[in-house]
């Protein structure tokens, strides 16, 4: 899905222009999702510029959410995460995919089981809810049992506010990657 789309960080000014347009178009905005990538990869001062604009211009907004990668969460200090929460970041959606390190390696996740657990716990400890997604069927027939057991233990080690499960069903001979 994302192979054809090149990731690039948008300038905060561009995001503020989009928000200004949305303010003119919509009378009441209760939820804002900072979409199309991982907003947590931004330096905190840039993300705070966006959150402060939302606070000022969308006083009725009850919730701001975004996608996040474990590595980007781990680059932020507890103080930085708490500051994001104070300025309205309510929840981060994170794809863990599996609790099995073998499966994470097999699908080239680029993050370890330990990083995923630590990042979710850091978010929750800073007052930001984590919504974590796992993928049933991702391990294939060889690793299904390890995938299931390790995912269960990982969920137990996380302090996530929400956990969801997606199901992957491939038709043979579809490659996993």
Residues covered by each model-derived region:
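A short, flexible beta-alpha/helix-coil linker loop
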Residues: 2-5, 39, 99-101, 136-139
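Short acidic, glycine/proline-rich loop/turn micro-motifs
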Residues: 2, 103-106, 175-176
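Conserved C-terminal portion of the radical SAM core fold
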Residues: 34, 91, 114-175
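Canonical Radical SAM [4Fe-4S] cluster-binding loop centered on the CxxxCxxC motif
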Residues: 1-17
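Short, solvent-exposed loop/turn segments at secondary-structure boundaries
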Residues: 7-10, 43-45, 105-108, 142-146
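Conserved SAM/AdoMet-binding glycine-rich loop
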Residues: 23-125, 129
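Aromatic/hydrophobic pocket-lining residues that form the small-molecule binding cavity
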Residues: 12-15, 47, 77, 116, ...
């Amino acid at each position: 899905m994302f192979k054809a789309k090149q990731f690039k960080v948008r300038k905060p000014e561009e995001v503020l222009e989009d928000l200004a347009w949305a303010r003119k178009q919509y009378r009441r905005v209760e939820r804002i999702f900072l979409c199309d990538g991982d907003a947590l990869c931004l330096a905190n001062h840039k993300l705070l510029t966006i959150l402060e604009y939302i606070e000022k211009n969308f006083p009725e907004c009850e919730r701001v959410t975004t996608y996040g990668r474990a590595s980007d969460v781990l680059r932020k200090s507890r103080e930085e995460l708490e500051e994001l929460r104070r300025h309205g970041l309510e929840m981060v959606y994170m794809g863990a995919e599996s609790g099995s390190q073998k499966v994470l390696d097999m699908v080239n996740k680029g993050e370890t089981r330990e990083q995923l657990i630590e990042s979710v716990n850091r978010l929750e400890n800073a007052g930001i809810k984590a919504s974590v997604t796992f993928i049933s069927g991702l391990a294939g027939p060889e690793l299904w049992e390890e995938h299931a057991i390790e995912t269960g233990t990982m969920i137990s080690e996380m302090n996530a506010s929400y956990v969801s499960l997606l199901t992957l069903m491939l038709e043979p001979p579809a490659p996993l990657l």
